[in-house]
């Protein structure tokens, strides 16, 4: 019984990671981990861009969401943009 449970959990993790790879969804933590590997200057630049993006989105009512990967505001109807 416990082997079946472990197999089921492992299969769930595999499906989850495959889904993340296929859809291209990455979390803020994933982005920061990659930035840390590239060096402190790159990480600082990414954090600065995300902060600028948050500020810009707050200033314009028609833009409410911020895309972490590209430091620009996205229209509300753009599905791949997400809140930061």
Swiss-Prot record:
Residues 1-24 form the signal peptide. One of its GO terms (cellular component) is extracellular region. GO terms for molecular function: toxin activity. Expressed by the venom gland. It is found in: Secreted. Contains 3 disulfide bonds. Keywords: Disulfide bond, Secreted, Signal, Toxin. Belongs to the scoloptoxin-10 family. This is U-scoloptoxin(10)-Er1a. It comes from Ethmostigmus rubripes.
